[in-house]
Amino acid sequence: MLSNILPLSIGAIFGTTARWLLNLAVPASLSPATGNLFANWTGALLIGIFAETVSHPQWKLLLITGFFGSLTTLSGFSLETVTLLQSNRPASALANIFLHTAGSLLLTWLGLKIGTAVK
């Protein structure tokens, strides 16, 4: 059990830190949602690639479940969308939903294709 928890936890620490750093790197002139969008899109692409190229169970736990699971964030996306709705910005909320959902699905698919090609 500990042999699974350790790689999972290490991946989660670095994934969460990467998401936080991405949010800090977003210029103040852009929407606060931009950092999470970039994290979700990057994570979606890379999770597809690594799902196809990593076979060792411990590395899958560290990278896919730990790192990319904590890099990408449904809770941040949900908060941003609800905040936009509460700010009476329904068009921005719908755009946020579309960009996160469609972009993440497309990039995961692309990542799987890339992973298959390099395998």
UniProtKB/Swiss-Prot annotation:
Entry's Gene Ontology BP terms: cellular detoxification of fluoride
Annotated transmembrane regions: 5-25, 30-50, 59-79, 92-112
Pfam families, per the entry: CRCB
Reactions listed under catalytic activity: fluoride(in) = fluoride(out)
Chain residues that bind Na(+): G69, T72
Entry keyword annotation includes Cell inner membrane: yes
Main location as per UniProt: membrane
Biological function: Fluoride-specific ion channel. Important for reducing fluoride concentration in the cell, thus reducing its toxicity.
Entry similarity comment: Belongs to the fluoride channel Fluc/FEX (TC 1.A.43) family.
Protein's UniProt name: Fluoride-specific ion channel FluC
Species: Neisseria gonorrhoeae (strain ATCC 700825 / FA 1090)
